[in-house]
């Protein structure tokens, strides 16, 4: 399970889209996996009439315009994904859906707004996820030199990798 963290406009959504595509397509060393993508605001897949306009991978099922919490539950029940990807966790109902994802055997790939791990830990939702050691890694993006730059990668305990 991986959480991408950055302030708005630093490349979380773009990096998430690229990761989804690469996980879905696979490569010569790693086989592709089925990915369930909840695209609540249409920023990831950019669907038009139900067809993704952005490349999110050949094994990716997209729920477009669906609330994150509902979408995660729907994907688990009906699409059998190996990986569930969502953008911008933050609401209490997202937390309950995240619990379902992690307890059903799926891998979670998500993003959250914040400047640092400490920043998002001010929210009880993320405090609980960290205490449960849900995320194996936290990837912090920033604006140093350019948007989308990886500033830090932390393990599930918040220690540098």
Model regions: which residues?
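Switch/connector loops and helix/strand junctions flanking conserved nucleotide-binding motifs
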Residues: 44-47, 118-121, 146-150
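P-loop NTPase nucleotide-binding module
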Residues: 1-40
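Peripheral, non-AAA+ core regions of ATP-driven protein-machinery
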Residues: 1-10, 14-17, 51, 119-128, ...
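Well-ordered alpha-helical segments embedded in enzymatic catalytic cores
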Residues: 15-18, 68-74, 97
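Conserved P-loop NTPase
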Residues: 136-161
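Glycine- and other small-residue-rich loops at beta-strand/loop junctions that grip anionic moieties
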Residues: 5-8, 61-65, 86-88
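P-loop NTPase switch/communication element
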Residues: 24-75
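Conserved P-loop NTPase nucleotide-binding/switch module
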Residues: 79-138, 143
């Amino acid at each position: 399970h991986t959480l991408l963290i950055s302030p708005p406009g630093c490349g979380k959504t773009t990096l998430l889209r690229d990761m989804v595509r690469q996980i879905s397509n696979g490569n010569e060393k790693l086989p592709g996996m089925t990915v369930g993508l909840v695209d609540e605001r249409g920023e990831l897949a950019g669907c038009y009439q139900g067809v993704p306009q952005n490349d999110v991978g050949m094994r990716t099922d997209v729920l477009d315009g669906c609330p994150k919490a509902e979408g995660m539950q729907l994907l688990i029940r009906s699409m059998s994904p190996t990986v569930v990807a969502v953008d911008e966790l933050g609401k209490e109902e997202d937390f309950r859906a995240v619990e379902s994802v992690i307890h059903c055997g799926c891998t979670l790939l998500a993003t959250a707004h914040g400047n640092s791990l400490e920043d998002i830990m001010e929210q009880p939702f993320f405090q609980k996820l960290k205490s449960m050691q849900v995320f194996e890694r936290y990837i912090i993006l920033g604006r140093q030199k350019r948007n989308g730059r990886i500033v830090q990668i932390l393990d599930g305990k918040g220690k540098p990798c």
